[in-house]
From Swiss-Prot:
Localization of this protein: Cytoplasm; Cytoplasm, Cytoskeleton
Disordered: annotated span: 316-350
Gene: TWF1
The protein's name: Twinfilin-1
Lineage, highest ranks first: Eukaryota, Metazoa, Chordata, Craniata, Vertebrata
Residue(s) carrying Phosphotyrosine: Y309
One example GO MF annotation: actin binding
Family (UniProt): Belongs to the actin-binding proteins ADF family. Twinfilin subfamily.
Pfam family, one: Cofilin_ADF
Species for this entry: Pongo abelii (Sumatran orangutan)
Coiled coil: none
């Protein structure tokens, strides 16, 4: 895009650039006038670069006019003194001016000599290109590249979240995540639930104080469970699911993680996702609570009687029973196994 502008440096400007590269100047201000790069002002060193910086740079920045500033550091590389290239494009400047200066940046760097430019700083407000702003820029350059909010959320979820439905033969994993402490009231409520003194416990994260606290212990029937799910904030729920299955009366503890989509802040979603696995580890190991099922929902309306029953007692796929093996000869079969690994075959007697 820089070639489309046709803007070049005049011979006078090139001569000043040459003297500047040799250390004569501390600062050059360059503008675009009549389709040429021109020197607006220049200054010689007065003190060390950091003491000169703000007093030299900031007074030259106009509120509605873009410009370029080349500021010389005291350090040198193989080609000579090192420079900071500042591209100033204030918010209130004309759009055409912004585009013109953006398109000519590469031309200016080529004319001056890119090997002399140590850092490039872009600013729309003075704080961006002040000495403090430059130091913040250096700090950001030494840190990992920043992610977008969505990328950061996804990264945290992938790093911190460990599968909670693991088989009995799964090797032990070090659980990663944010292990916020659990308040005394919340822990006591979970103990009561485990002892069947409560049938519902709702927990929330106190984000400001970084602790998991008790939110609700209202006696809850299955038909009332959807009403307990907030529509504008995340929660953890432990529910004592009383039901019958194949003629047996069962009381099963179900963990429900409710996250109402994107009505919550990114920070809230990240924290609830990260704290979930450490919370379950504490509950299952320290309280010896048998959590029969872990469910994630974004809407309380999902918690119907049929949904919960099928989550706790998943239906067997019909095709698994479609091709039954024929029975072997009488007297040749061993004791029938109820659970068989994939590699196992029917045991036979001697």
């Amino acid at each position: 895009m820089s070639h489309r502008t046709g803007i070049q440096a005049s011979e006078d400007v090139k001569e000043i650039f040459a003297r500047a590269r040799n250390g004569k100047y501390r600062l050059l201000k360059i503008s675009i006038e009549n389709e040429q790069l021109v020197i607006g002002s220049y200054s010689q060193p007065s003190d060390s670069w950091d003491k000169d910086y703000d007093s030299f740079v900031l007074p030259l920045l106009e509120d509605k006019q873009p410009c370029y500033i080349l500021f010389r550091l005291d350090s040198q590389n193989a080609q000579g003194y090192e420079w900071i290239f500042i591209a100033w494009s204030p918010d209130h400047s004309h759009v055409r001016q912004k585009m013109l200066y953006a398109a000519t940046r590469a031309t200016l760097k080529k004319e001056f000599g890119g090997g002399h430019i140590k850092d490039e700083v872009f600013g729309t407000v003075k704080e961006d290109v002040s000495l403090h702003g430059y130091k913040k820029y250096l700090l950001s350059q030494s840190s990992p590249a920043p992610l977008t909010a969505a990328e950061e959320e996804l990264r945290q979820i992938k790093i911190n979240e460990v599968q909670t439905d693991v088989g009995v033969d799964t090797k032990h994993q070090t659980l990663q995540g944010v292990a916020f402490p659990i308040s005394r009231e919340a822990f006591q409520a979970l103990e009561k639930l485990n002892n069947r003194q409560l049938n519902y416990v709702q927990l929330e994260i106190d984000i400001k104080n970084e602790i998991i606290i008790l939110a609700n212990t209202t006696d809850t029937e299955l038909k009332d469970l959807p009403k307990r799910i907030p529509k504008d904030s995340a929660r953890y729920h432990f529910f004592l699911y009383k039901h019958s299955h194949e003629g047996d009366y069962l009381e099963s503890i179900v963990f429900i993680y409710s996250m109402p989509g994107y009505t919550c802040s990114i920070r809230e979603r990240m924290l609830y996702s990260s704290c979930k696995s450490p919370l379950l580890e504490i509950v299952e190991r320290q309280l010896q609570m048998g959590v029969i099922r872990k469910i994630e929902i974004d809407n309380g309306d999902e918690l119907t009687a049929d949904f919960l029953y099928e989550e706790v007692h998943p239906k067997q796929h019909a095709h698994k029973q479609s091709f039954a093996k024929p029975k072997g000869p009488a007297g040749k079969r061993g004791i029938r196994r109820l659970i068989r690994g994939p590699a196992e075959t029917e045991a036979t007697t001697d």
